[in-house]
């Protein structure tokens, strides 16, 4: 503590400096809070995710309307919206004249000033591109109603254009506008899997100015694989093969899948059940490429099932002996008995299975797995992405008195918290999530060991009965591949998913996490909201928002929308309903046609100031430290 005081004294070495900083902090605390965007279940759909950020989930169009009113035509508003959202595309369209720049840049500066109105000058300065910060500030705060200032403004603008700096200048201003409109981003899990663009999503998050992440079940298998869990890695790669983006992942992360590909090509033949699900991307694949993915998909699936059988045997404390594994198959009759009913097997690809020891890897499989793991853990880009997940991520987040988590808080059928009994201890509610997070961080410390308890527990997070990220009694992947009877495919959801409609239970969960404010809410992802069937994203008497992004094209037929995101500004919450995203060019051509539908959920009685937020708590703590300094050293 004494050392900290010495550091503080070095920075604030006079009474006036302390007073100035206290005044600055008080000014910031009394400004309105910034706008937060909550988004979930991106599932590798980079372009749709990128559009939500570029359009600021519809806020951009609203700000343009509010800023310019009737002074701009609808066509001009369209063009301005497209420019701020996708400046790179708009600036490439045709040759822009000097007059176009002289008309457009002042509009951008007006919009920037409008977006910055509720922030301090310091906040605006931090949002500006450093190379243009001084000049943009000068232009933003110039009163062009005064003749001298108008001339000053026009001269600076002309000089920027003459220096051929107009394009990077516009790019910088557009980025600053978007940054001011979304002050903080919450990603409520499942960045990975289904779509090919997870690496691009992670790259964008790496450079986002302020964010937090709540881990999802599909994120956890990538983390587990990187930390040494072969079972997690095989799940991640199998899903990539199933949805046809394995080669995209291989290229993006520099993975070496050659040993796997050669082994699969030698061992397997065509099997329609393992044909990749490509959707509209099927036209991009040749018949040979599809066959190759079929073979690789089979290889990854069988290896995954072998590794999972080994893990379940290794971890009796997981209490998963009732799960269907390769050991329970009758290979002579090719059938599987579940609940005393015998089921014939279909789509089988058991070439490498020894019926006397089904979970043992063949030498070629073992070599392929070792090669994949070395490649997985050796990828610099993947390491960068996993580091971001660890630095910004957690099992849950309490932010501004709201509770964010991806999956569920396991509950008994009675509505009580469901305990995980393990190693002579039991964990429920908040302690259950803390238990999993502790072991995930332990596994990250030593990725050379892949079969320790902490690393195995990451795999349990993926599919364990009491995993807050999974939320079902079992995962029936093996049954779905090899048994026709759909009764065997059923996965029963945890009681949480029915109880989350109860205001009483939602209040109980909030209080479990120390949240007793009437303004506190929960934000949850994981399960698509089936709007077409009358489901609402608002649950529990308004205490819970379910915001599965629905960006994944495969879900949109079920949901009837491209999902939801949530906005929270100083006036309250707004629920945003997204329409299916086509492509960036369509947005450039008709940005207001893509406008997201907003629903104001609740307005606060008084505008929320920074002093009432999580950041405000940090700033007020700094104030207390400075007051203590003032009293102790400057005779205040």
Curated annotation (Swiss-Prot):
<dbReference type="Pfam" id="PF06874">
    <property type="entry name" value="FBPase_2"/>
</dbReference>
<dbReference type="GO" id="GO:0006094">
    <property type="term" value="P:gluconeogenesis"/>
</dbReference>
<dbReference type="GO" id="GO:0042132">
    <property type="term" value="F:fructose 1,6-bisphosphate 1-phosphatase activity"/>
</dbReference>
<comment type="pathway">
    <text>Carbohydrate biosynthesis; gluconeogenesis.</text>
</comment>
<keyword id="KW-0119">Carbohydrate metabolism</keyword>
<keyword id="KW-0464">Manganese</keyword>
<dbReference type="InterPro" id="IPR009164">
    <property type="entry name" value="FBPtase_class3"/>
</dbReference>
<dbReference type="InterPro" id="IPR029052">
    <property type="entry name" value="Metallo-depent_PP-like"/>
</dbReference>
<keyword id="KW-0378">Hydrolase</keyword>
<protein>
    <recommendedName>
        <fullName>Fructose-1,6-bisphosphatase class 3</fullName>
        <ecNumber>3.1.3.11</ecNumber>
    </recommendedName>
</protein>
<comment type="similarity">
    <text>Belongs to the FBPase class 3 family.</text>
</comment>
